[in-house]
Amino acid sequence: MNKSSFFIAGQHAVIEALRNPDRKVLRVFLTEDAKKNIHRKNPRKNVLEDVKVYFKSKKELDKYTSKEQLMHGGYVAEVEHLDQPDLKEYIKEKKNCTFVRLDEVTDPRNIGSLIRSAASFQIDGLIIKERHFPKDSKLMYKSASGCMEHLNIFQVSNINSTLKNLRERNFWVYGFDARGDKDFTEVKWEGKNVLLFGSEGFGMREHTGKYADFFVKIDMSKDIESLNISNSAAIVFHHLSYLKKKSWLFNK
């Protein structure tokens, strides 16, 4: 089956795509300096060996990113989408795992930044509605800084039925809301969990929130109304990563 191709831009996005054996890279457009940098960063393997490489000036590369007003840094690539992981298969053998679910979060920069944080702190995956996911967005790939290659992204057609099915499989669903019952650090965070985040402007929709078992919040200054969604998520991911590491050291 032929997969649709699209363009990505930026040093980290392009280099990590080249390093990923599961990512088909069709063509790479580079400045001479960018090519040298790729070889410096990959001294043991020529990641450009099986790829069509075209050398361009920065001005020539601008045409690929001018619409998004994106800085390419001398790196542009045409790639195919990765195979989609299957959520049901993934959770079959898992005793402990954490997923993130975004509700009405559509800004590609925010999604990309959140993906970067999730991959950095070893979250198991992102669950997102197919039609709300900007899967071809250069902005998202640039904001993710190469982490699109390191996080499972589960695209589903019906979020509510997915949450219902996960709850039936012993997942706890935590909705993050400024009016939550308690601070998220008071939760033990054991077993299987789904972290449910709403959009910055509108929060979580009521009919999605009804699938949450608990509502929790991030305690912060009363003078500040809210945090950016990607910042909020990064705080939570770091805390969960810390607890996981602490538990591992304790049981070592």
Which ranges hold each PLM region?
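RNA substrate-binding interface of SAM-dependent RNA methyltransferases
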Residues: 23, 48, 92-182, 250
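Short acidic-hydrophobic, aromatic-tinged amphipathic segments that line or gate anion-handling sites
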Residues: 8, 53-57, 151-160, 216
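Short, glycine/polar-rich helix-capping loops at beta-to-alpha or helix-loop-helix junctions
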Residues: 40-41, 133-139, 202-208
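N-terminal positively charged helical leader segments and presequences
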Residues: 1-89, 249-252
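Short, ordered loop/turn segments at secondary-structure junctions
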Residues: 33, 58-60, 131-133, 179, ...
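Structured adenosyl-cofactor binding patch, chiefly the S-adenosyl-L-methionine
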Residues: 120, 141-145, 209-252
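Active-site/ligand-binding-proximal alpha/beta "capping" segment
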Residues: 174-228
